Amino acid sequence: SDVYKRQGNDFASEIIFSIRRLAEPMKDHIDNNFSPLSPVQKDDFGKVSDQIIYFLRNCATMIRKNDYIGFEELIAESITLMNQLTALKKGELKRIQGQSGSTKVSMVYLNMVQEAQNVVSFTANLLKVSRKFQKE
């Protein structure tokens, strides 16, 4: 059970680091008055970010209540979110190849999507470890 505690702590730390890596480049971008995200980027990421927030809240509730009913569905949701975020990255890379939009904005956007993907992955892993820890 010490292993699960340590793994859980590692995943929680990774979530915090990913959120920091997500937020800092966006803040720098805004502070430097660089171009905003394109309407397509805002729309695409906005749709998935609402789903990510819902997923994170459900995971937090499950861990807090120590009630793992619906665990498999949440893990399936994490896989769906990861696939959606991968599709966003592919779409952005196609836009870069088509030379539409600012490369600097694209890099900030790709970083946002990657770190959001990390948050989802680490949260799903934290959920798995928490459940294993509680079963012991």
Regions found by a protein language model. Name each.
Residues S1-E136:
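Cytosolic, long alpha-helical scaffolding segments
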